[in-house]
Amino acid sequence: MRLIGNRLMKILYFAWLKEHTGHSFEELQLPDGVDTVGALIPHITEQSPGHGAALANLDAVRVAVNRVYGDLATPITNNDEVAFFPPVTGG
């Protein structure tokens, strides 16, 4: 993966996403032109087969940006924290 620019962001993985990626978090350079969660996902999934498997079914993945629930259209910028996790239910 060729990344352009020097903007770092922290990517967090929880539950089975962590198991697939092999990481609880990673710091990545935010590629130029990537300004939403949806635009970031292809850059994550090309890192390894595990990353691709973790984000293969986006209907089963939730996202938060800077600890606020979001979706694929949520804007991201340098130094943001993006978390991917399975749906959470209360009870």
Language model feature labels by segment:
Residues 1-90:
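Ubiquitin-like/PB1-type beta-grasp interaction modules and other compact soluble beta-rich domains
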